[in-house]
Design a protein with these regions (language model features):
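A short, Lys/Arg-rich alpha-helix, primarily the initiator
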Residues: 1-18
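Helix-turn-helix DNA-binding elements, focusing on the entry/boundary residues of the two helices
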Residues: 12, 23, 34, 49-52
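The alpha-helix within a helix-turn-helix
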Residues: 16, 27, 56
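Short alpha-helical DNA-recognition segment
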Residues: 20-39
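Short, conserved catalytic or interaction motifs in soluble domains
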Residues: 42
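DNA major-groove recognition helix of helix-turn-helix/homeodomain DNA-binding modules
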Residues: 48-65
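Interfacial/linker helices and their anchor residues that mediate assembly or domain coupling
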Residues: 68-108
Length: 108
């Protein structure tokens, strides 16, 4: 994922900077080691679900919003940014729209 910007990593870095905290401070508050946090922020590693949960709690942000960014990054890492990936995402969007409409009362 190093060739692409990590939206999740950038977001986490912005949260940390807004709070004027070091990686070490976040590490202590999340029990995730500093080198791993640095790699997540730089987009060199994907966070685990447990790490996302800890980061969401630490920063007091929605775990679901972190998981959305995480899922998008997993897709892009696996399939790259190209027309095929775009078309596949559009197809998934069409296929999932009825579910979203039923379960949340809104359409994508």
């Amino acid at each position: 994922m190093s060739s692409q910007k990590s939206e999740l990593g950038q977001y986490l870095r912005e949260l940390r900077k807004e709070r004027q905290e070091t990686l070490h401070q976040v590490s202590k508050g999340t029990d995730i080691d500093s080198p791993m946090l640095s790699k997540i922020e730089r987009g060199e590693r994907l966070a685990t679900n447990e790490q996302l949960k800890r980061l969401a709690a630490f920063y007091k942000v929605s775990e679901a919003s972190l998981k959305v960014k995480h899922t998008a990054e997993k897709i892009l890492k696996e399939y790259g940014i190209n027309e095929t990936t775009y078309d596949a995402i559009q197809l998934v969007n069409e296929q999932i729209a009825p579910y979203i409409t039923k379960s949340k009362g809104k359409k994508l």
